[in-house]
Amino acid sequence: MTAVRIAKAEDKKAFYDLWKICFGDSDAFCDWFFRNRFAPDYSVVLETEGKIVSCMQAFPYTLWIRGREIPGAMLCGVSTHPDYRKKGYMGQIFTYEMKLLREKGCLVAPHTPAVLQSYFPFGHFPVADAAYLTCDG
């Protein structure tokens, strides 16, 4: 049986482990991220047979748009364990997450997905181009 629910603080290790499996980021980054950005009350999990196999994180994020403060949540870490992919789990957690964020009053949900096209079936499309600038020194 599968069930989608709001994450709990005690799910942090499962989120961390799934992030490492799916994205391969360094321990230093993951440690920082989960210490500073993990917000279980803004995140969702999908469990099957009592095991978290898919999750989506978000954390509160305020944007300034045309001089107005807009409440939102930054989406990140949408992940499904490789053994459980192609079962429609992303669609289930995405739908649940969007409902949760609406209930929390979030008007925008920006994200920087590793695979941008994976968000298209759920109605999330780019609204602006981005440029990354670096400087020496």
PLM segments and residue spans:
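Conserved acetyl-CoA pyrophosphate-binding loop and the N-cap/start of the following alpha-helix
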Residues: 84-96
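Extreme N-terminal leader/targeting regions
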Residues: 89, 107-108
